[in-house]
C-alpha cells in the first residue's frame, strides 16, 4: 500500500500539523479514540468504578518512585539497610520518594481489593468477561509476588524474618520441600544470594509480567465492553449510531469523573505520606527500622497487612483442625455425588480426588495443608465465573439474603486480616478456623446458594438518574 500523507489546511496550527504528521506514521489518534476518547461505556457507573483508573495511577507512582529508589539502593546484605537510611537522610527528597513508594504499595492493594469487590457485587466475572477476570486474578498474583520480593529489600528485622518464614513454608511440601526452599533462597538461610535474586524479581521480572497482564486486561475489557451496576449487556440495545443507547463516550464524561476521583485519592494519599507514613506500623513496620539480625528472632512475626487474611488461613490449620477438614472434604464429595446432575464419570473423579485428599490429610502434617489452603484461598478466585450459577449478575437483583452472605464473607475476610497481624492465641486460632471454613464455604457452596431464592426482574435498560 502506498504511503499517504495526512492532508491539513495550510493555516492549521503547528500542534495539529505535528499530530497529523505522527498520525500518518503511527495511529496515535486512533489508539486514543479506540482505548478511551470514543470508547463507549455504560452511563450508570458509580463510585466503585473509580478504582480501576486509580490502580493504573498507583502503578505509575510505584514504577516512577521505584526507579528513583533503585538509583541509590544497594542490593547487598552488608549495605542494603544503610543504603535505605542514606536515601532517607542524604538523598534530596529521598524520604519523600521512599514514603510514596511504601504508601503506594498499601494503596495499590486497597484499590485492587475494592476493584475486586465491585466485580463480586456486580458480576463482572460472568460471561462474556471471564478472561478479563482471569487476567485480573493473574495481576493480583503478580502484585502479591511483587510485594513479597520487595518486602525483603529494606533488610530490616521484620522483612528478613518474614522472608525466612515464608520461604520455609515451601519446606513443608513433601519430598521436594527442603530442596525447593534451598533453591529459592540460594543458601541455607536468607542471605545476600536471596537478596540479589529477590531484587531482580522485584525490579525487572515481575514488573514486566505485570505490565503485560495489565495490557491484556484492558484489551480484553475493550473487546467485550464494560459491565455496569445493573449487570445488563448494553450492547443488546444499540442506537442508530451503532453504540449502546445507554452508553456515553469515556471522554469527556468519565475523564471528568476520574480526575475528581484522582484528586480525592491524591489528597488522602498525600496526607498519609506527609503525616502518617508508617500508619501505625501497618504500612512500615517498626521492626523494619532495625537492621536484620539473623541471630535474633522477633517475638512476633507477621506479614504486611494485605497478606494477613491468607496468613490467618495458613495459621488456622492445626493438627486438631485436620479432622474438621477431613469431614468437610467427605461432606463436599457427598454433596456433589448426591445433589448434582453431573455425569457419572465426573462424580467418580470427585470421589477419587476426595479419597486421595483424605489419605493425604492423614499422612502429611498440618503445616503442609496450611500451605495448600493458603494457596488455594487465592487461586479459588479464578473459578468464580464457573462457581456462580445465579440467573442474574448484579447484587441489586438477587435475594436480600444473598446480600447478607456477601456481607458475612466480607466481614470474615476483614476478621481474618485482623487476626493475621495479632499474635496467635487459642481463642484467635479458633476464630480463624471458623473464618477459614466460612471463607471456603462461600466459594465451594456457591453453585448451590447462588441459584437459590427469589430473584428480582432485571430491567431491559440500565437504571440511571441524572444528577
What is each stretch, according to the model?
Residues 2-107, 111-467:
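Membrane-embedded and interfacial regions of multi-pass energy-transducing membrane proteins
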Amino acid at each position: 500500500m502506498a504511503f499517504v500523507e495526512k492532508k491539513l489546511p495550510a493555516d492549521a496550527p503547528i500542534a495539529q500539523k505535528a499530530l497529523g504528521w505522527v498520525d500518518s506514521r503511527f495511529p496515535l489518534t486512533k489508539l486514543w479514540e479506540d482505548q478511551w476518547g470514543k470508547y463507549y461505556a455504560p452511563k450508570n457507573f458509580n463510585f466503585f468504578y473509580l478504582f480501576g483508573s486509580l490502580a493504573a495511577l498507583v502503578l505509575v507512582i510505584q514504577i516512577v518512585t521505584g526507579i528513583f529508589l533503585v538509583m541509590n539502593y544497594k542490593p547487598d546484605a552488608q549495605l542494603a539497610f544503610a543504603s535505605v537510611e542514606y536515601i532517607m537522610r542524604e538523598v534530596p527528597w529521598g524520604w519523600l520518594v521512599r514514603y510514596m513508594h511504601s504508601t503506594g504499595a498499601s494503596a495499590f492493594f486497597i484499590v485492587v481489593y475494592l476493584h475486586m469487590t465491585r466485580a463480586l457485587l456486580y458480576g463482572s466475572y460472568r460471561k462474556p468477561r471471564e478472561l478479563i477476570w482471569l487476567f485480573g486474578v493473574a495481576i493480583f498474583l503478580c502484585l502479591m509476588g511483587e510485594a513479597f520480593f520487595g518486602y525483603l529489600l529494606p533488610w530490616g528485622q521484620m522483612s528478613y524474618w518474614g522472608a525466612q518464614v515464608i520461604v520455609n513454608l515451601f519446606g513443608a511440601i513433601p519430598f521436594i520441600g527442603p530442596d525447593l526452599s534451598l533453591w529459592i533462597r540460594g543458601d541455607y538461610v536468607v542471605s545476600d544470594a536471596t537478596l540479589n535474586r529477590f531484587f531482580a524479581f522485584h525490579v525487572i521480572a515481575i514488573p514486566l509480567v505485570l505490565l503485560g497482564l495489565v495490557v491484556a486486561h484492558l484489551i480484553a475489557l475493550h473487546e467485550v465492553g464494560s459491565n455496569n451496576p445493573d449487570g445488563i449487556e448494553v450492547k443488546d440495545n444499540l442506537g442508530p449510531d451503532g453504540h449502546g443507547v445507554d452508553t456515553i463516550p469515556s471522554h469527556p464524561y468519565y475523564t471528568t469523573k476520574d480526575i475528581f476521583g484522582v484528586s480525592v485519592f491524591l489528597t488522602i494519599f498525600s496526607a498519609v505520606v506527609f503525616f502518617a507514613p508508617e500508619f501505625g506500623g501497618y504500612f512500615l513496620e517498626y521492626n523494619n527500622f532495625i537492621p536484620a539480625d539473623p541471630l535474633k528472632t522477633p517475638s512476633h512475626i507477621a506479614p504486611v497487612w494485605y497478606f494477613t487474611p491468607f496468613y490467618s488461613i495458613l495459621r488456622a490449620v492445626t493438627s486438631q483442625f485436620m479432622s474438621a477438614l477431613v469431614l468437610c472434604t467427605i461432606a463436599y464429595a457427598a454433596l456433589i455425588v448426591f445433589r448434582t446432575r453431573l455425569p457419572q464419570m465426573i462424580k467418580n473423579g470427585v470421589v477419587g480426588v476426595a479419597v486421595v485428599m483424605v489419605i493425604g490429610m492423614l499422612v502429611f502434617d498440618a503445616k503442609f495443608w496450611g500451605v495448600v489452603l493458603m494457596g488455594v484461598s487465592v487461586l479459588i478466585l479464578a473459578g468464580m465465573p464457573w462457581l456462580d450459577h445465579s440467573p442474574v449478575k448484579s447484587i441489586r437483583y438477587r435475594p436480600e439474603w444473598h446480600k447478607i452472605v456477601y456481607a458475612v464473607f466480607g466481614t470474615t475476610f476483614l476478621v481474618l486480616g485482623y487476626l493475621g497481624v495479632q499474635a496467635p492465641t487459642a481463642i484467635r486460632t479458633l476464630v480463624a478456623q471458623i473464618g477459614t471454613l466460612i471463607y471456603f464455604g462461600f466459594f465451594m457452596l456457591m453453585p448451590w446458594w447462588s441459584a437459590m431464592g427469589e430473584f428480582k426482574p432485571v430491567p431491559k435498560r440500565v437504571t440511571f438518574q441524572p444528577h
